[in-house]
Amino acid sequence: DLTIKDGEISLLDQTQSSTPTLYNHIDVKLSDFAPNTPFTVDASVHMAGAGEQAITLQGKGGPINSQDASLTPFHGTLQLKNVGVSDFTKFLNSPATAGTDGVLTGETKIDSDGVKVTANGQTNIEKAKVRGMELGFPVSMQYDLTDDVPNGAITVRNLTTKLGSTPINLNGTMQTKSTPAHIDVNLRANNVSVAEAAKYAAAAGIALTPGTTVSGTVNANIHAVGSADKPALSGTLSAANLQASGKDLPQPVQIQSINLNLTPTQIQSNPFTITSGTTTANAQLTMRNYTAPSATVDATLRAPNAQLPAILAMAKAYGVTSLDKVSGQGTLNVDMRASGAVKSLTAAEIEKTLNGTVNVNFNNVKYSGANMSSELSKIAGFLRPGSSQSTSGMTNISKMTGNIAVRDGIAETKDLQATLDIGNVGLVGTANLATEALNMRATAVIAQNVSQQVGGQQIGGFMKTALANNQGELVIPAIISGTFSNPHFQPDVQQLAQMRLKGLVPNLSNPSSLTGVLGGLLGGTKTPGQTTTQQPGQQQKPADAVQQVLGGLFGKKKQTNPPPK
């Protein structure tokens, strides 16, 4: 017999490391231990943390396999009693579970014939934490599985995981010799709490916007076969009474029900609705050849007469941060379709396939990312900025209207007009929804009273970066590049030269002629003799706000754009 009390054991796995691992606070009693004979083991480890924490292994094993100790036959029981995960991690000297904690209790029966190892039992985790985040509910696992070690084949007869009171059942096989592993498994889940699943996902690093809470239930009946990273799926997945709410959401966002039908070649949803307040967005999604290197998506989203606060709420509920600096009122009409091949199912790839239209009619919009009045004053060289041109990074837009056409992920406007406190701004140009690039031209017409306040024809940029029309209104053409969240402004000397050459100087009362001039510079059509006008001065940020609305609807969108040539 061999007895060890409060001892230390050093083990070296030469296939994994050249440094031995030291284990301490160990009690071991071996009976009938001799070469080529079975033996009895009674071993326990006492954790050094708070409370009574013990791991006990009892059973019969041997003879020891001299070639590979892991293939030694063994029949026994492993017990965990109030074992702290963090203390267990320290004992194992392993960083793999850093940030994870909880209290483990359970019992597992182990049977190994030297080739196949079967484990049957249950483990419970109380006060579970993942990445330092308290889950707020217990986690338990019941399992019955066999590992054919030499052949790398795992058979899962039953694996039931409970997040709180909700069970998720899995069974099937896994071939682990290939990379990635090959799986053939069935998964069933009935009335899984979305709130509990979201907490677990958030703790694992997959989260919605901070401060957002979700509720609802999910049912799944799925058969997955193939490579573990891209298995072919069959079955159904459905969710009901989904709702997202939170302190940062203007109003709750709801999906009453959504059903996904899964086949090995296609995933298709039923037509479903997303609602927030009085706004309803109608959507449908189909994904084909999803196991191939290049899948095909076909998705639609239509939201007639949608309220801007509702669209902002929907965007924030789904983790879109590009709209965090935007608030306001008004409506927009959205008719979009994403259709085409994508290399991956990322937002940037899907955005490249977007086509459709957006019509906006906003009011009282605030954008906290920049001050367009300040940017325009720098370009024009205002002598006396005046009280209306705050140095704060806020753009106030009392009115914004226009149409946006999207083709293959490029959003283009020819008539976007915005009313600012200093005058009107008209914008034309494009925004790349995938690369976040802005390629815009803007013309600001400063109201006469404001024009006089800032210096009139005595401004530093007069006849260089700004003109005056016959009504005494300053006109400032500008190029906007950069991104939605960080636009860059510079003088548009080409547009200025065109205005001087053709005598087309916009005014406040004729915004249509303004877009004609801009359209001509960008290769579009213009009406001879028209004078371009802008709606009350705006900052590039208004355009930014519209593009970001698109971003909210179809994923995070920002854009960097090369300056127009």
Each predicted region: which residue ranges?
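Hydrophobic residues on conserved beta-strands that form the core of alpha/beta folds
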Residues: I4, Y23-H25, T105, N120, ...
